């Protein structure tokens, strides 16, 4: 035990010891039933971790530590999600570069020392190398923070979603999806981000409100009558393929089945009926354009309409007019729009409509909900592209029902979050587009043969051999071809896309467990026990992982999901990097100590949003210091041998009452952890601990300083040792550093490898016959009386009297008179010695009364 107990530097000391001793090393020799496996969330490697990460990762770490102390071999890996758009954006901003796949690779390339004002174009391979270099630096910083926080991860079980093993597993899973018909290539309307120029999945959408304008424009019927349509996107007028009205709308029933002519472009379009048309929206009749929104896609598909694309992948109108625009005036009108952004094209169309007399009344402002890519800053467009899809139940009711059922098999913590999963699955409108038009990611493992004219045959893709995985089709030639045949007639071309980052992240149980790579390990850890994650990615990570496991193994990937809430800033808004209101955690860990920050984190229940609160961290630090001080006090009374924590030595009623209460705390804390309510475990343990320090230690102090051969003194020593031995283990999952420090002063090994306490340890069967006879002789009915509570109440009354009289707590009490029922007075007699010593009481008188026990204090 050090001369002066301190929290300073204990994180560095114990992190090093844990690593050297392999304290958290997974034992892969045990059977599956003895394993507790965690599908740890791999944090996105795109800058710094924030305090929200510390909050949620502490929760799962506390549970992993509890399970380890319960005797389970804990499989607790760590991954890095280091592929995808966030990483690309960080590299672009950090180095001041942009990827240009048309440029050749420069093996001697060195990025600018300072980011230039205009991004420097580099080859795809050079760009990927920069991504790898920067993510490796970020991963080192992430690992240092996690170690400082005290995550009990087995760092030998680390993976990155872009490493060779992860890429091979991701590509293998995709190819198996393809072989079973669960993955397919299709030309289809695609949600498209014009800034990043990539497809976006439904799960990555974000609704945002923005100001728009309704324009009322006139189509013309076959009889020459005007048909008024209101739209917020007049720039899509050249993409109009039909008008649509509700079949019961009497205003337009006479027009259904007829044809109207579009203004400016003179294109005949059919007038169709559909129940999704809204009579009370605008004029009640709407344009169907290819494509303005997802409703357009639905109408286009269900009404079997043609396609007239006008929007390019860059967010500008295509240079050539779509099919149907044929007469000279219409072509000329379109040419004034070609190459314009959607914003500029809208203004130009309005100008042309006004000049043609087809814009009716003044434009009307409106607030509309528009779909954005969650990481983008411009509204999404819908354009027709060729993409890879995985079937997810969006168009298959049988698969959708099976996935809903999977959600009901899963244990949700908290349970109410299950409805979010079900609502998402039930609301799917299409399959999962998994291809992305980006650069740093897992390549789609596909090539296409080229015919004699150099056209790709998409219907017969070339697939790699399994043993060749991972492959990069952009640099690897398929079996049977030479590199010289790339992009040549009769040769091959690579699929240029990479997979959505969720396509790889959805396989984290398989990647961490070594599916198809380490069959022995996989059999010991899969399906996993726990998936901890944030609730806002239920629709992405959780759902996609359930989907892939259902398709590959016909089972859930884990049995329980633990969902964390958000961290809220002082304005009660979610903390996030995109909002710029996050707090980086390292300064907090250094200022308050890791255990203090963990204390704040564990105070937030599963699924509950929690305020960022340094006040809670200060309380946590005081608690950690108090644990050291309490340990120091207990260890004053002898060596670890003399302080052997055995119930057989506990004979005094007050000591046994304290341990009985502690036994109840152990049971409550155990129940909390088994139900993933780590907050309950902390609360009940902390509440007991402060009572233990404030009341029991004061009550027992004088007796504990007595002669060691006195039975009552031995009882105090044994009770103190038992309580400390138990409390350090109860606090260990939440406060790993201070408990390990205190444990090391008097126990062998690590507290984190010690057995989790049980209530039975504290109430029997080791209670000696002598102790039992002592209790029976007292006739107190001790088992039904909270002697510690009774003694604490009397001591509190004594303290209060001294405080009100402005006297020292060591000032003597001339007389303590207790009035109450005979049973209460008899119970007090069992603890009278300790109360008198703690309160410095000279005389005690008792008087029976038919009232609760009431103390009267006469100060000396």
Curated annotation (Swiss-Prot):
Residues 469-491 are annotated as: Disordered. It catalyses: tRNA(Val) + L-valine + ATP = L-valyl-tRNA(Val) + AMP + diphosphate. PROSITE patterns: AA_TRNA_LIGASE_I. The keyword Transmembrane does not apply. GO terms for molecular function: aminoacyl-tRNA deacylase activity; ATP binding; valine-tRNA ligase activity. It comes from the Bacteria. PANTHER family: VALINE--TRNA LIGASE, CHLOROPLASTIC_MITOCHONDRIAL 2, VALYL-TRNA SYNTHETASES. ValRS has two distinct active sites: one for aminoacylation and one for editing. The misactivated threonine is translocated from the active site to the editing site. NCBIfam families: alt_ValS, PRK13208.1. Belongs to the class-I aminoacyl-tRNA synthetase family. ValS type 2 subfamily. This is Valine--tRNA ligase. It comes from Salinispora tropica (strain ATCC BAA-916 / DSM 44818 / JCM 13857 / NBRC 105044 / CNB-440).
């Amino acid at each position: 035990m050090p001369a002066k107990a301190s929290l300073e530097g204990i994180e560095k000391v114990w992190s090093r010891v844990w690593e050297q001793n392999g304290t958290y090393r997974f034992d892969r020799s045990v059977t599956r039933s003895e394993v507790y496996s965690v599908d740890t969330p791999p944090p996105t490697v795109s800058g710094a971790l924030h305090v929200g990460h510390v909050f949620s990762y502490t929760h799962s770490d506390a549970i992993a530590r509890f399970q380890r102390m319960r005797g389970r071999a804990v499989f607790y890996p760590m991954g890095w999600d280091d592929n995808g758009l966030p990483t690309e954006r960080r590299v672009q901003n950090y180095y001041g570069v942009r990827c240009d796949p048309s440029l050749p690779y420069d093996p001697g390339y060195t990025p600018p020392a300072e980011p230039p004002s205009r991004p420097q174009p580099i080859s795809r391979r050079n760009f990927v190398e920069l991504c790898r270099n920067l993510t490796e630096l970020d991963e080192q910083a992430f690992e240092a923070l996690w170690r400082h926080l005290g995550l009990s991860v087995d760092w030998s079980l680390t993976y990155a979603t872009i490493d060779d093993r992860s890429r091979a597993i991701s590509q293998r899973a995709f190819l198996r999806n393809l072989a079973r018909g669960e993955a397919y290539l299709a030309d289809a309307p695609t949600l498209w981000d014009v800034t990043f120029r990539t497809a976006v999945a439904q799960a990555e959408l974000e609704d945002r409100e923005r100001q728009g304008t309704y324009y009322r424009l006139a189509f013309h019927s076959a009889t020459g009558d005007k048909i008024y349509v209101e739209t917020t996107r007049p720039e899509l007028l050249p993409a109009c393929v039909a008008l649509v009205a509700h079949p019961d709308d009497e205003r337009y029933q006479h027009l259904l089945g007829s044809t109207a002519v579009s203004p400016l472009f003179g294109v005949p379009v059919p007038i169709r009926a559909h129940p999704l048309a809204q009579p009370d929206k605008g004029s009640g009749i709407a344009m169907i354009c290819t494509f303005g929104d997802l409703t357009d896609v639905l109408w286009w598909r269900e009404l079997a309409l043609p396609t007239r694309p006008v929007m390019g992948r860059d967010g500008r109108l295509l240079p050539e007019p779509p099919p149907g625009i044929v007469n000279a005036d219409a072509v000329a009108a379109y040419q004034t729009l070609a190459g314009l952004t959607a914003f500029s094209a809208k203004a130009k169309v309005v100008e042309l409509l006004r000049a043609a007399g087809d814009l009716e009344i003044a434009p009307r402002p409106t607030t509309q909900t528009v779909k954005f890519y969650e990481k983008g800053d411009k509204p999404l467009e819908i354009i027709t592209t060729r993409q890879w899809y995985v079937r997810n139940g969006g168009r298959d009711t049988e698969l959708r029902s099976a996935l809903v059922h999977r959600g009901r098999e899963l244990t949700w913590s908290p349970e109410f979050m299950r409805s979010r999963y079900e609502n998402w699955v039930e609301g799917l409108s299409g399959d999962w587009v998994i291809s992305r038009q980006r650069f740093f990611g897992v390549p789609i493992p596909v090539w296409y043969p080229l015919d004699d004219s150099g056209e790709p045959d998409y219907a017969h893709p070339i697939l790699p051999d399994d043993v060749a995985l991972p492959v990069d089709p952009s640099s690897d030639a398929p079996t049977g071809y030479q590199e010289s045949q790339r992009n040549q007639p009769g040769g091959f071309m690579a699929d240029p896309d990479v997979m959505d980052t969720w396509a790889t992240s959805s396989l984290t149980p398989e990647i961490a467990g070594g599916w198809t790579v380490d069959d022995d390990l996989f059999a010991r850890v899969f399906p996993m026990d726990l998936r901890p994650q944030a609730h806002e990615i239920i629709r992405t990570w959780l759902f996609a992982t359930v989907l892939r496991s259902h398709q590959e193994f016909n089972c859930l990937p884990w049995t329980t999901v633990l969902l964390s809430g958000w961290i809220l800033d002082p304005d009660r808004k979610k903390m996030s990097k995109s909002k710029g209101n996050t707090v980086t955690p390292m300064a907090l860990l250094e200022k308050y100590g890791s255990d203090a920050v963990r204390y704040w984190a564990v105070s937030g229940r599963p699924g509950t949003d929690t305020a960022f609160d340094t006040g809670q961290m200060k309380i946590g630090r005081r608690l950690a210091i108090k644990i050291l001080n309490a340990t120091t006090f207990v260890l004053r009374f002898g060596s670890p041998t003399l302080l052997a924590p055995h119930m057989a030595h506990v004979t005094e009623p007050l000591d046994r009452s304290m341990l009985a209460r502690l036994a109840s705390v152990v049971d409550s804390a155990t129940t909390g952890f088994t139900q993933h309510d780590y907050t309950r475990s902390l609360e009940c343990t902390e509440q007991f601990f402060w009572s233990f320090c404030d009341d029991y230690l004061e009550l027992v102090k004088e007796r504990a300083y007595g002669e060691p051969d006195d039975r009552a003194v031995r009882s105090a020593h044994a009770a103190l040792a038992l309580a400390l031995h138990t409390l350090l283990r109860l606090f260990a999952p939440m406060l790993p550093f201070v408990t390990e420090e205190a444990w090391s002063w008097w126990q062998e090994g690590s507290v984190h490898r010690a057995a989790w306490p049980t209530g039975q340890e504290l109430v029997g069967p080791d209670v000696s016959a002598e102790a039992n006879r002592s209790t029976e002789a007292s006739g107190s009915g001790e088992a039904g009386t909270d002697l510690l509570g009774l003694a604490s109440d009397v001591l509190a009354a004594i303290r209060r009297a001294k405080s009100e009289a402005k006297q020292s707590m060591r000032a003597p009490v001339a007389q303590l008179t207790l009035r109450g029922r005979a049973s209460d007075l008899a119970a007090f007699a069992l603890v009278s010695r300790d109360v008198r010593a703690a309160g410095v009481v000279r005389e005690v008188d008792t008087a029976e009364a038919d009232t609760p026990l009431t103390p009267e204090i006469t100060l000396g």
